Amino acid sequence: MPFDLDAYRAQAEAFLSDTDREYYLHYSGQRDEFEIEAVFDRHANLFTHEAAGSLREAGAPGPLIEFAVEGHIGRETRALSAELARREAALEIEWNGASIPFRSAAVLEANEPDPERRAELDAARNELTETELNPLLRELLDSSHAITRDLGWPSLQALCEELSGIDLAELGRQTDAFLEATDSRYEELVEPQLRKQVGMGFDGLRRSDLPPFFRAPSLDAGFPAERLVPSLTETLEEMGIEVSGQRGVTIDTVPRPKKSPRAFCSPVRVPDEVYLVISPVGGREDYAALFHEAGHTEHYAHIDPGLPVENRYRGDNSVTEAYAFLFEHLTSDPAWLRRRLGIDDPQPIVDYGRASKLVYQRRYAAKLGYELELNGGGDVDGLEQLYARRLSEALRVQWPGAQWLADVDPFFYSARYLRAWALETHLHRALTERFGESWFAEPEAGRFLRDLWSTGQGPEGGEGILARAGGGSLDFSVLLSDLG
């Protein structure tokens, strides 16, 4: 009996909808329970070894096979993942005369003004990661690699390259070239911003000093809480998107005690039910997070409902991340800052935005090269040294090897972010060339984006979006233009 691809797609969509609804209800503070395991149990037949094999034999699109394979690996390792989450939630750190939850340490680190106390907290985090979490993370990694081989691929890299259509090795060469090309400008662009935000340059800088650098509280005054949501709705409305009556989109601003403090997007039914969840606080970081998630929201809300599930929910996530970056980077765009927030001299924010983005890009470029070694099918023993060396050299800070397993994006999602930065740069260039520096205030730019959004995530992925936007090659070297 031939494999019923339509039935599989229908159940896959039901699963994705159920999981995103669970995510929305829990993290918006409406439900204490997070019953994700029950969702997996209801749809367990989607993720069997046989389902993955049948999809391959039926010649199903890569993103649909990718969905089945990732789900199969996740299902087979769910006990390890659950134990890891339980152990992490139970861990506490003795710091500053008190016991604090392990998961709260990152936030405390970002807001701690004393660099020595930050370093003590970071050292305690690394020690617990090494002793309590890494043994489980190593077991999880080894199990994932074994399941990958059992499915017929020699390595996780080979699996991801075949199913995503992304040449990860070539992207690794491009990002290594980016590291080399930006090496001489890195300290010049970043050090002044480090001194402004954390009071020190690269001499004496530790990893624990980077969270407050990314927090950048000195810039918060220009980003008031009362303008957070209006600045977004006004931007969208000038592009011809009437948010108040937009079909399928709910902007959830209701205060709830257990609501996530960070904005997020839940595409429950694409494009008919998409939630943008906000807890308006204000500050530069809050604006950036909201606009990032708004980019996802508008993309999902405008996707053609007739597209198959793999092109509405799955496909090349470089695409939706590019739209998210496009909106996020408005919060460091001088024309937008003047127009929407009335900032007369936006240059300090622009300079900080350029520096922080370069740190992120070099970090992910260094991480990709390491992850190619980690998931390339070879022996992983000793790779913590490679991880520490690549990150230390890229960021000019002594990076701890203890994070070599915790700081890994599943299924090379780091590559999606890297490609998204390149695609966003191309899109921004196309928008400014067609509609001017204030493209975000032009209805024609809104129509241009809605046309792109309607195509979903595929089937040609980021390359297809770039072709529709005006052509060119999705080459990571385009990011060099950001450096002036």
List PLM regions with ranges.
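N-terminal helix-rich structural modules
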Residues: 1-131
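C-terminal, non-catalytic "cap/extension" segments appended to globular domains
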Residues: 20, 26-31, 42-58, 155-158, ...
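Contiguous, non-catalytic segments that form substrate-binding/exosite surfaces or channel walls
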Residues: 81, 123-275, 281-284, 467, ...
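Core structural elements
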Residues: 99-114, 143-156, 205, 392-393, ...
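Post-HExxH zinc-binding segment in Zn-dependent metallohydrolases
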Residues: 175-185, 303, 314-352
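Active-site-adjacent bridging/hinge elements
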Residues: 203-209, 261-273, 294-304, 339-346, ...
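Active-site recognition of the HExxH zinc-binding catalytic motif
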Residues: 282-304, 321-325
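Active-site metal-coordination segments of metallo-dependent hydrolases
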Residues: 309-323, 356-359, 409-419
